[in-house]
Amino acid sequence: MFDKLQSIKERHLDLERMLADPAAAGDQTRFRRLNKEYSDLKEIVQAYDRYASARQQLEESRHMQKAEEDPEMKAMAREEMLELEERIPGLEQELRILLLPKDEADSRNVIMEIRAGTGGEEAALFAADLMRMYQRYAERQGWRCEVLDYNESSGPGGFREVTLTISGHDVYGTLKYESGVHRVQRVPETETQGRIHTSAASVAVLPEAEEVDVEIRRDDLRFDTYRSGGKGGQNVNKVETAVRITHEPTGLVAACQEERSQLQNKERAMKMLMAKLYDIKLQEQQQERADMRRTMVASGDRSAKIRTYNYPQSRVTDHRIGFTSHGLPHFMQGEIGELIDALKMHDQTERLQEAARA
């Protein structure tokens, strides 16, 4: 492991020198590739430096503890030595996690689909709540979040389905754990007897695809246009600017109505369709690994009930890892980072154990 870490550090220094060369900016494609590799290695190098520094301090403390004659200085050296011996295994574990193979899609932007499930109008309201939760989390992360398409429910404020695009650093790697069925328990505003109702909404997180990821034959596509309910200004409900694309071999559908022109909506819908087809490819790869890896955390099983939001008890529970928080109002305001970090750590621990067994 440490030979590999030393090689990574040397590569990081090489990249730093290459990026500092003014000529590097002449080829923007190469510059972006080098800059991404540099950024990807930076966290590993920083963790390795912390580990190496702690090891060096430990050796110095051991030497001082043996060589020092002053009892007080000897005791100080021993105290520092014990502290470092306790801290170093954690730093080593951090390095092992950082060296785990990365999911090639982790750095990509995502398309997120939220659909109301069982529960009628209450499920549609919950879908809208989830949308706002993710929008606020994206804002906290410094990501860009846009609504691509939506289908409002019959009642005010709800969505039968809504599609978002979220762009930024490591978006898929962070949000991929959100795929699945989210269940809510609360008293609807229309409930006169105070009874708690259970509703559900499903979330699908798809990594944005690039043209090289999927091959689409134009003959396999059907394009339909319709009147938009989006932000088309004077065109709204007058011109058919909204676009729906159907991939006939699979039956997959992607639609966009939020842009001002038909061409822009067509481009956005095409991106959504590519993401859906790429997701099928990823799901097939994950299924191939399913026999070796039983954890549901990153399986992306869309039918799995992953989380319950209990409003009367102000509690949110993630059933995959047994995580419980009693700060539901803050959670719904987008403060979901603690849970996402716990899911990441659980996933990484599972992968470390899998690597140790291999």
UniProtKB/Swiss-Prot annotation:
- GO cellular component entries: cytoplasm
Tell me which Pfam families the record gives. Answer: PCRF, RF-1
A single Gene Ontology MF term assigned here is: translation release factor activity, codon specific
Q: Which InterPro entries match?
A: PCRF, Pep_chain_release_fac_I, Pep_chain_release_fac_I_sf, Prokaryotic/Mito_RF, RF-1
Name its cellular compartments: Cytoplasm
Instruction: Provide this UniProt record's keywords sorted from A to Z.
Output: Cytoplasm, Methylation, Protein biosynthesis
Where does this chain mainly localize? cytoplasm
Does the keyword field hold Cytoplasm? yes
Describe the PTM: Methylated by PrmC. Methylation increases the termination efficiency of RF1.
Q: Which residues carry this modification: N5-methylglutamine?
A: 234
PANTHER family documented for this protein: LD18447P
The Swiss-Prot or TrEMBL record describes its family as follows: Belongs to the prokaryotic/mitochondrial release factor family.
Matching entries from HAMAP family are given as: Rel_fac_1
Function recorded in the entry? Peptide chain release factor 1 directs the termination of translation in response to the peptide chain termination codons UAG and UAA.
Q: What is this protein called?
A: Peptide chain release factor 1
Q: Its encoding gene is what?
A: prfA
